[in-house]
Structure formats: structure tokens, C-alpha cells
Design a protein with these regions (language model features):
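C-terminal glycine/acidic-rich active-site capping loop/insertion
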Residues: 1, 136, 237-242, 271-350
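C-terminal helix-rich "cap/oligomerization" subdomain common to oxidoreductases
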Residues: 1-7, 80-82, 327-380
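N-terminal Rossmann-like dinucleotide-binding module
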Residues: 1-58
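Predominantly a Rossmann-like dinucleotide-binding segment in NAD(P)-dependent oxidoreductases
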Residues: 6, 17, 138-230, 284, ...
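Beta-loop-alpha module in the N-terminal Rossmann-like domain of NAD(P)-dependent dehydrogenases
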Residues: 61-123
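Hydrophobic residues in well-ordered beta-strands that form the structural core
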Residues: 106, 112, 131-133, 276
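Rossmann-fold dehydrogenase core element
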Residues: 119-137, 157-159
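Glycine-rich, aromatic-lined ligand/substrate-binding cores of catalytic
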Residues: 200-282
């Protein structure tokens, strides 16, 4: 039986030095000493693969140039496989691991659309398999504090939720170490669901579902191309209807100059409203219908974000993206320990196939709405 003092062993598939997300997963998984990355097939490029292993202290005998060989050789020696390849390559790896009954931690988006979800469902058994998808923004302490406030009814009956994630990367690629970080080739092609929805939209869907604990019932959407990359959706606007007459909107963009990552949540009830901005993650803006305005941070009267696990350093020292990701990895660790011990205990912050499916169905409906120029219903 696993206890919460034991490190679990991970093998990475993808996520090398030349990956967009690999180093973040490596750092976040180990920040709280819950996991150790002990094996990997980090890159198809042998030099990058070897360099990544050396950088991360992975022994050459646990380094593989082929992910299938990694699975075969390490399946009895690691506790989970982490899938960090580009999204279009997820499906083959996921189905292979499920058929072998091996635990999976998968970078979002899970796959490229509902058709590939159906392939997963054909070999997935929720009572037998472990599949966690990493949506890290709900790992921020003040987002979790907001969820706590909503459950307490602090904002009253929710009426509106607006989520946005504007970025400028297609118009102004970030300069990293003197080199422009150009979009990866796979991001310049759309699939069953447009790639911008796989990249940014699934985060917005996750946050809305996490906070409201419900799915939208219908959407109307407008897709646009504003970049130099032809026939590629790079800007999406969506209106949403939810149960209980809740209205919502989502905006995601890769061509919004001035926004490195402008992720923002605004939520309105009949007693108050809240705003959280990812570039100022330790503050939650609250407004009440008696005129009070409040900025709540970890040093304030928090009832959830004041936990020790969210305060690796005392308030006044801002937390960041990797720490939020590490919060999620700790949640995954706890649920994975229960799974490996044969106990059925679900963590409230770990999400898998069902939410991934709902998100991809939403954006498939948005694509259809853009084509029909009309509202599209979402069916469970």
C-alpha cells in the first residue's frame, strides 16, 4: 500500500528540452517531493533526448528513443506514464497504455476531438483505469478560494460568467534567450476541433465547469483568422447558455497584441462579483451589492487559500505558474496513491476523460455554430 510519504515514479513520453511544456511538468511534479522522473522517451531527436536525460538526471539505462520500448521495459517499474507529446500524437499513446492497464497523466488537450474520444471510450473503464488530464489554472490558490466563496453563496445566485485568454504569440512570438519562440508546426493546423480551442479553449471550459459545477447547454460562436497563417483559426468568441439562466462568454486569441497571457475570470451574482487575473494571481477582486470593494489575498481573511500547502512562502512573496501546477500534481499524487492501493477515493481537483469529452464536445458545437451562424445545442 502506498503512503503519502513515498515518492511515486514517473516516466515521461515527450516533454524534452525542445518541448513547450516538458520542463514545467518536470519541475511541478517534483516541487513537493511527491514524484520522481526516473525514465523517459523525451524526444524523437536523439540529441535532444539524451540532453534532456542528462539535464534531469535520468540514467541512460532508463532512456529510450522509442516510446513503445519505454512502455514495455518500464511498465513494471514506474507508477504512471506522463504524456507530453503534441496533442495530435496523444491518441495512440493513450490507447496503448489503457490496453495495458497502465496509469496515465496527460497534458491537455486530451485528444483532438470527439472522434478520438470515442476511440478512448472503446477501451476505457472508469473502474479499472487511471487517467488524469492536467488543467493547471485551477491549481492557483485564489482560484480555489473563489470556488470556496461560490459554494458558500458569497456572491449570491450566479448570473454571468466571462472567461478570456488573449495571447499575442502569432503576431509577436516571445523572445526567449535572444531567439523568437515561433509556434510549433502542429499548432499551425486545425483538427476536428480548432487547435486554438485545444490550446486555450479547454482551459476556459475547465475553469467554467470547475467554478459553476455545470456544463453549458448551448453556444453560438464566431471564428476568425487575423494572423499571417492562412486558413487557421486564431481568434474565437463564444456566447454560452447554462442551466439556471446563467449566461456566459469565452474569448480566446493568439493575435491580441499586448497580452502575453491575459487569462481572466469574471463572475457575477445577485449579491456580488469577483475578478481574477492570472498575471496577478495572489489577488481576488470582490465587489458587493452594498458598495463594498475588497481585494483578497493570501494574507487576508481567506478560508481556503490560507492552507499550509498553498503557502510555501508567506504572503507578500507571489506564487506562480509552476507552483499552481505543483498543487495539481499533489492532488494527482493523492488520487494515484488511492488508485494504486485499490481504494476508491476521488480528489476534487483531478479531472479526466469526462470533462475532457465535455470540453471537446463544446468546441465541436462551436465550430458547427460558426458554420451555421446559429445557436447549437450541446447534448450529453
Amino acid at each position: 500500500m502506498n503512503d503519502n510519504n513515498k515518492q511515486l515514479k514517473l516516466a515521461f513520453i515527450g516533454g524534452g528540452n525542445n518541448s513547450a511544456v516538458g520542463y514545467v511538468h518536470f519541475a511541478a511534479s517534483q516541487l513537493d517531493n511527491k514524484f520522481a522522473v526516473v525514465a523517459g522517451a523525451f524526444s524523437r531527436n536523439p540529441d535532444e533526448n539524451s540532453a534532456t536525460a542528462q539535464r534531469w538526471g535520468v540514467s541512460e539505462k532508463h532512456l529510450y528513443n522509442d516510446w513503445e520500448e519505454l512502455v514495455e521495459q518500464e511498465k513494471n517499474h514506474v507508477d504512471a506514464f506522463v504524456i507530453l507529446t503534441p496533442t495530435p500524437h496523444h491518441i495512440e499513446v493513450i490507447t496503448t497504455l489503457l490496453k495495458a492497464n497502465l496509469p496515465i497523466i496527460c497534458e491537455k488537450a486530451l485528444v483532438t476531438g470527439p472522434a478520438e474520444v470515442a476511440e478512448i471510450e472503446a477501451c476505457y473503464d472508469k473502474n479499472k483505469h487511471f487517467l488524469a488530464v492536467t488543467y493547471n489554472y485551477s491549481g492557483y490558490a485564489m482560484v480555489r478560494e473563489l470556488k470556496h466563496l461560490l459554494k458558500q453563496g458569497a456572491l449570491g445566485n450566479i448570473q454571468k460568467i466571462h472567461l478570456e485568454m488573449p495571447q499575442e504569440g502569432f503576431r509577436r512570438p516571445p523572445d526567449i534567450a535572444g531567439k523568437p519562440s515561433m509556434p510549433q508546426a502542429w499548432r499551425l493546423k486545425d483538427f476536428e476541433v480548432p487547435t486554438i480551442c485545444l490550446d486555450l479553449g479547454v482551459h476556459l471550459h475547465h475553469l467554467s465547469t470547475y467554478l459553476l459545477e455545470m456544463e453549458p447547454t448551448e453556444t453560438i460562436a464566431q471564428f476568425t483568422n487575423h494572423s499571417q497563417y492562412p486558413n487557421l483559426i486564431d481568434d474565437v468568441n463564444m456566447l454560452l447558455n447554462y442551466p439556471n439562466n446563467i449566461k456566459g462568454s469565452m474569448w480566446m486569441s493568439k493575435t491580441a497584441i499586448g497580452h502575453r497571457n491575459g487569462l481572466q475570470i469574471r463572475i457575477y451574482g445577485d449579491k456580488g462579483s469577483a475578478r481574477w487575473f492570472q498575471l496577478n494571481p495572489d489577488e481576488l477582486e470582490l465587489n458587493y451589492n452594498d458598495g463594498r470593494r475588497e481585494i483578497l489575498d493570501r494574507a487576508g481573511q481567506c478560508e481556503y487559500a490560507n492552507q499550509f500547502r498553498y503557502n510555501r512562502m508567506k504572503p507578500g512573496h507571489p506564487t506562480g505558474f509552476v507552483e499552481a501546477f505543483s498543487n495539481l500534481y499533489t492532488d494527482i499524487y493523492e488520487e494515484l496513491c488511492c488508485y494504486l492501493a485499490g481504494t476508491d477515493k476521488k480528489n476534487d481537483y483531478v479531472f479526466g476523460l469526462e470533462q475532457a469529452k465535455d470540453g471537446l464536445n463544446l468546441f465541436k458545437a462551436a465550430k458547427k455554430s460558426n458554420e451555421s451562424r446559429s445557436w447549437e445545442e450541446l447534448k450529453k
